[in-house]
Design a protein with these regions (language model features):
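A glycine-rich phosphate-binding loop feature that marks nucleotide/adenosyl-phosphate handling sites
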Residues: 181, 319-324, 506-507, 523-525, ...
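Conserved short loop/turn motifs at secondary-structure junctions
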Residues: 179-186, 246, 487-492, 522-529, ...
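Ordered core of a single globular domain
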Residues: 665-668, 673-682, 687-688
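N-terminal export/assembly segments and adjacent metallocofactor-ligating motifs
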Residues: 1-449, 457-468, 484-487, 539, ...
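Secondary-structure capping and boundary motifs in well-ordered enzyme cores
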Residues: 267, 274, 292, 478-481, ...
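Short hydrophobic beta-strand segments
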Residues: 175-180, 242, 515-523, 688
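Gly/Pro-rich turn-and-neighbor structural signature
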Residues: 169-173, 186-187, 490-523, 534-540, ...
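Acidic/polar loop patches that form or flank catalytic/metal-binding clefts of enzymes
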Residues: 61, 205, 310-318, 498-501, ...
Length: 688
């Protein structure tokens, strides 16, 4: 009976209006009069679609969109997509801390009001402040101490405009530089500021490299900028490695592909010094010491080359290496300063008699043709990219001069004229090791003889793969003193050699059976280290040796700010004011800050910090100071730098006109001649 009475009481509570007033509050909380589609534009690559529920123009709540199209049959759906940062985005919109108005340093605002009271012209008012040492120090010393006051837009815009005009008149337009993060975050916002910079003659600073999101290994290796695969491709991989990429945190919308890939048979290795969010997804978590991923991969590559390229020549790997890498290219072996020999440059095609007259012969390279037993010049080098004859900038294994087929010979191990002891750098120990390398001798067009080997043979020697040649090669994997053996890696990585060997064999076997379905997920955890490019390239080697790049389920996947602009060309015309003039004034931000902030004063020569190549020739770039290299880069035209000259460039142009230079070409020639005669210098030569 009591149960029935309790039930009746409960029903009475449910239908009593007074007891259900809380429901009205709940309904009001989720009310909306429309739903709009949007995303959270906070420089996030995810770009997740969200349904934004709006009432009276106010965001009331948000819900993830669930209508992504399927990319292809067999792939899991894209949703769910979203993250904790996104779903709380409306908090930023309505936060009392959000800056909605211009703020100005109080000390500067007081000075500005005084100056405007005394000067009708805003430019004159600003000039009176900036040229008054006491006034200038007053607002500069207030920096970092708070004291910001809200002001109106007209005042803010007037100060900005007056300061820019004053700077241009006194010092020149290239004394003004503008910076904004990635344009893909907001193309219109970025373009408006960048266009202003270009139209007034200012410089636009780079962004991707400045905050260390650009993986320099990508342009160094492939000449592109983070053209990585779609994250759904993780599902195709049969072995995934995550290093320096905390996928659960930084790619939350995509991390479900990790879990789904494992259901599909993918094995996930995570290299992380701590048990990170992504480590919970791992089949194997390897706590590699911080900053030592490069040592891990170098030892892995030693195993891969030993077992999958030398002891067993895996057909797929060998074919891929011949077709898609520079391993078959011929490299000169040249005398070093100490009388020994060291690897030189790639042998230029133009140095041989048969190719002496080809266009851009200094920018075309050679392979050894296994069938004809002679050097041949494959298409696809830089010289073909800029040649007058089109259609040769490709990877077809054909001679660029006569069109004959090329069967690249990777190694001279079984067919050589001599074995020479080549000096190779051991940067870990700060010394050198001497190892035997098979070479052939060629006669150049001028009658000189030159010894050459293949890049592949040099790789084998550098990695210490014992192929029965004389020299300082390791006896086996357990040699702790020979660079790049599994035993050598232990003192850097903190991981036992048995784990590394097992990983390398799994990697190679997986790639062999799947034809390259091994992927490295990599990110800021590695990229923000000094020499990150070398850690990246060590991993890239493992991908190359096993034919993983360019394959579905394989490759290097760098996920830090790799957003791209879809309308890149038309957008650039607007943002860089190309509809008015070209070229634009663009400056790499790291150099700009390094020089102008006097960071260079706090550094010493390269050799005080780093192990550099031993016995390098007189033209080496591995000696000196970074600032010396920066000056050299500007003087030789490798890098732009602004401001260009100590003088106002407007005054320089006037002087050139007065000297009779009556066209832009003559002005440029006049300036170049004065630079050559040391009558002018670049501002980077005297940054203060």
């Amino acid at each position: 009976m009591s149960i029935i009475q309790d039930a009746i009481a409960w029903i009475r509570d449910e239908i009593t209006p007074q007891g259900r007033q809380w429901e009205e509050f709940y309904r009001n909380r989720w009310q909306h009069d429309k739903v709009v589609r949007s995303t959270h534009g906070v420089n996030c690559t995810g770009g997740c679609t969200w349904n934004i529920h709006v009432k009276d123009g106010i965001v009331t709540w948000e819900m993830q969109g669930l209508d992504y199209p399927l990319l292809e049959a067999g792939l899991p759906p894209y949703e769910p997509r979203g993250c904790q940062r996104g779903i709380s985005f409306s908090w930023y919109l309505y936060s009392p801390l959000r800056v909605k108005y211009p703020y100005i340093r109080g000390a500067l605002l007081d000075l500005w009001r005084e100056a405007r009271a005394n000067h009708a012209d805003p430019v004159a008012a600003w000039t009176s402040l900036v040229e008054n040492p006491a006034a200038r120090q007053r607002w500069q010393r207030a920096r970092g101490k708070g004291g910001l006051r809200r002001t109106d837009w007209n005042t803010a815009l007037e100060i900005i405009s007056a300061s820019m005009v004053s700077t241009i008149k006194k010092h020149g337009p290239d004394r003004i530089a503008g910076f904004s993060p990635i344009p893909a975050m907001s193309m219109i916002s970025f373009a408006s500021g960048a266009r202003l910079m270009q139209l007034i003659g200012g410089a636009s600073l780079s962004f991707y490299d400045w905050y260390c999101d650009l993986p320099t290994a990508s342009p160094e290796t492939w000449g592109e900028q983070t053209d990585v695969q779609e994250s759904a491709d993780w599902y195709h991989a049969k072995m995934l490695v995550s290093m320096g990429a905390n996928i659960g945190m930084t790619r939350t919308p995509d991390c479900h592909f990790l879990a789904e890939g494992r259901h599909n048979g993918t094995k996930l290795w995570v290299f992380s010094p701590d048990f990170s969010m992504v480590a919970k997804y791992a089949d194997e978590w390897v706590a590699v010491n911080t900053g030592q991923d490069g040592a891990w991969w170098m030892a892995v590559n030693h195993v891969l080359l030993t077992e999958f390229h030398h002891q067993k020549q895996t057909p797929y790997f060998m074919d891929y290496t011949k077709k898609f890498t520079d391993a078959p290219f011929l490299v000169e072996i040249k005398p070093a300063a100490n009388g020994r020999v060291r690897p030189g440059q790639l042998l230029r095609a133009g140095r041989l008699q048969q190719y002496a007259k080809v266009e851009h012969g200094e920018w075309k390279f050679l392979m050894w043709d296994e069938a004809d037993q002679k050097p041949k010049m494959p298409m696809g080098s830089s010289g073909d990219r800029w040649g007058t004859e089109k259609g040769k900038w490709n990877l077809l294994l054909k001679d660029g001069q006569d069109g004959s087929e090329i069967k690249p010979q990777l190694s001279f191990l079984e067919d050589h004229d001599a074995v020479v002891q080549v000096e190779l750098d051991d940067f870990g120990a700060g010394g050198v090791c001497t190892r035997g390398v098979p070479v052939k001798t060629l006669t150049t067009a001028n009658g000189k003889q030159v010894q050459v080997t293949t890049a592949y043979d040099l790789l084998m020697a550098q990695y210490g793969v014992n192929r029965g040649l004389p020299g300082e090669y390791p006896a086996d994997y357990n040699d702790p003193n020979a660079p790049y053996t599994p035993a050598w890696s232990e003192k850097y990585t903190g991981i036992g050699r048995d784990v590394l060997i097992r990983f390398a064999r799994e990697w190679g076997t997986t790639a062999e059976h799947t034809e390259g379905k091994c992927t490295i997920l990599i990110g800021a955890g590695v990229n923000h280290w000094y020499h990150a490019n070398l850690m990246y390239r060590a991993g890239i080697h493992a991908l190359m040796f096993c034919g993983c790049i360019g394959k579905n389920g394989g490759g290097l996947a760098h996920y830090v700010g790799q957003e791209k602009l879809a309308p890149a060309e038309p957008w650039a015309a607007i943002a860089q004011a190309k509809d008015w003039f070209s070229p634009s004034r663009l400056q790499n931000a790291p150099s700009w800050h390094y020089v102008h902030s006097d960071q260079w004063r706090y550094e010493k020569d390269f050799t005080d910090y780093h192990t550099v190549p031993q016995n390098a020739g007189p033209d080496t770039t591995a000696k000196g100071h970074t600032m010396d290299m920066q000056v050299r880069a500007v003087r030789q035209g490798w890098l732009p730098f602004y401001p260009q000259f100590p003088e106002n460039p407007l005054d320089v142009a006037k002087q050139a006109r007065a000297a009779g230079a009556d066209s832009p070409e003559k002005v440029a020639s006049w300036v170049a001649k004065r630079l050559q005669n040391k009558e002018m210098k670049f501002s980077v030569e005297d940054p203060d």
